[in-house]
């Protein structure tokens, strides 16, 4: 099963996987129904979650109902418990919108919700993150999760994120970080998918961020807050994928 998951994730384009997931969801939910694992995003419970991972496959990682991963569920809890996202009037910009959040966010009456991506079939605005067709200071809240590690000129992308965010706005930018490394590792001469997988952990990544990720955000103009939100839950649940947040 784990080997099959790795093959599917590394061969089938993400846009096709997104479409297939919606078709298969009803059958998967029935097959895995139970009460051992609960997805906080929609409250559904299952006998187990699905395995997931491009290289090291994690058991019970992918929710059968929302297709959320650990980081998505953690972000949902952070938004719910630590922000006014669900009750304050906000204009929200969501990059590479995850299926786990899309319909939930669309139904929120308090937010004006725009989704944006260059390739995602779920986005309503098609644009390059390095050249956004958006006005300065036009959004109260920006979500950009696991996008910047795919972008060659991430500093330009960060500048664009800063440009379109209101001065008192909030941005949540998740990326994979190797917390053992002080500096980001990137090598743009590596273009072969297999070599990128070896170097950066995934075939379409162009870098592995180190702890200087936060410095890069500050250089773009952001005031950065580092949040170890997983520590609030480690005594209660097992979270397989460590995540760092800035907002």
Protein language model regions, located:
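Short alpha-helix
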Residues: 203-227
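Membrane-proximal basic amphipathic "stem/tether" segments
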Residues: 1-38
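Cys/His-rich microdomains that often coordinate metals
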Residues: 45-46, 69-70, 99
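Short cysteine-rich clusters marking metal-coordination/redox-active sites
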Residues: 39-42, 62-66
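Conserved alpha-helix/loop element of class I SAM-dependent methyltransferases that forms part
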Residues: 68-89
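Single conserved hydrophobic/aromatic residue that forms the stacking wall/gate
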Residues: 237-247
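Short linker/helix segments within small regulatory modules
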Residues: 51-60
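Conserved SAM-binding loop
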Residues: 87-192, 211-218
């Amino acid at each position: 099963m784990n080997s099959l998951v790795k093959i599917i994730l590394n061969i089938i384009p993400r846009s096709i996987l997104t479409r297939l997931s919606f078709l298969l969801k009803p059958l998967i939910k029935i097959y895995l129904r139970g009460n051992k694992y609960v997805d906080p995003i929609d409250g559904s419970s299952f006998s187990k979650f699905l395995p997931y991972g491009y290289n090291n496959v994690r058991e019970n990682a992918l929710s059968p109902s929302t297709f959320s991963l650990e980081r998505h569920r953690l972000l949902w809890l952070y938004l719910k418990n630590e922000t006014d996202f669900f009750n304050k009037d906000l204009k929200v910009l969501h990059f590479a919108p995850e299926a786990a959040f899309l319909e939930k966010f669309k139904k929120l009456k308090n937010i004006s919700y725009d989704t944006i991506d260059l390739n995602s079939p779920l986005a309503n605005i098609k644009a390059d993150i390095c050249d956004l067709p958006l006005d300065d200071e036009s959004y109260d809240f920006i979500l950009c999760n696991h996008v910047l590690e795919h972008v060659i000129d991430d500093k330009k992308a960060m500048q664009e994120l800063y440009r379109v965010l209101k001065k008192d706005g909030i941005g949540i930018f998740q990326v994979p970080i190797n917390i053992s490394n002080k500096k980001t590792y990137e090598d743009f001469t590596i273009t072969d998918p297999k070599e990128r997988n070896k170097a950066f952990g995934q075939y379409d990544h162009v870098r592995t961020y180190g702890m200087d990720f936060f410095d890069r955000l500050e250089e773009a103009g952001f005031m950065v807050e580092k949040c170890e939100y997983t520590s609030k839950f480690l005594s209660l649940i097992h979270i397989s994928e460590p995540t760092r947040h800035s907002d």
